[in-house]
Amino acid sequence: MGTPNDQAVLQAIFNPDTPFGDIVGLDLGEEAEKEEREEDEVFPQAQLEQSKALELQGVMAAEAGDLSTALERFGQAICLLPERASAYNNRAQARRLQGDVAGALEDLERAVELSGGRGRAARQSFVQRGLLARLQGRDDDARRDFERAARLGSPFARRQLVLLNPYAALCNRMLADMMGQLRRPRDSR
């Protein structure tokens, strides 16, 4: 099956426009690990480990298509540590997949509030909230959330900001057309 990093590379190749960093077990580097440790150091270690295990079970259930089990596990993690943003962020993803956009937005608001708008959970919550806003045609709200996620280091959010910028999109299209013409010059008859 490959290492988590192999999976991340394949994810980036085959799905370049999906949020990166949501792959369970992916080694995001020392900075991300430090960020996560700082977010979690306020919680009792035993409860934190149990909460993370429940979240992992929830993510695995969601990936297997068992959204009811995923929601149950995320709910258990929230009951265990109701002040930890990560479980709300994960539950929001499962709720969105289930079609409960209002519930997903509610969880994302709570995750942003608990994280203080900082760290990995906030970054992921801003990206998710931005995607939901974009799907609902609320581009200004989407842009604000993507800007916040980009400031927190999300490359996906940066790409979304470019896509939301009509001038950048036009420039990218013109550049692509020019490069295509340079690669395939017309017959000079």
Swiss-Prot record:
Keyword presence, Repeat: yes
Stretches forming TPR repeats: 51-84, 86-118, 123-156
Gene Ontology BP terms: central nervous system neuron development; memory; negative regulation of proteasomal ubiquitin-dependent protein catabolic process; negative regulation of protein polyubiquitination; tyrosine metabolic process; visual learning
Keywords from the named record: Repeat, TPR repeat
Signal peptide: none
Domain of life: Eukaryota
Keyword Repeat: yes
SUPFAM superfamilies reported in the protein's UniProt record: TPR-like
Disulfide bonds: none
InterPro entries, per the entry: TPR-like_helical_dom_sf, TPR_rpt, TTC36
Pfam families xref list: TPR_12
Family indicated by similarity: Belongs to the TTC36 family.
Stored PANTHER family: CDNA SEQUENCE BC021608, TETRATRICOPEPTIDE REPEAT PROTEIN 36
Name of the molecule in the record: Tetratricopeptide repeat protein 36
Organism this protein belongs to: Homo sapiens (Human)
Gene: TTC36
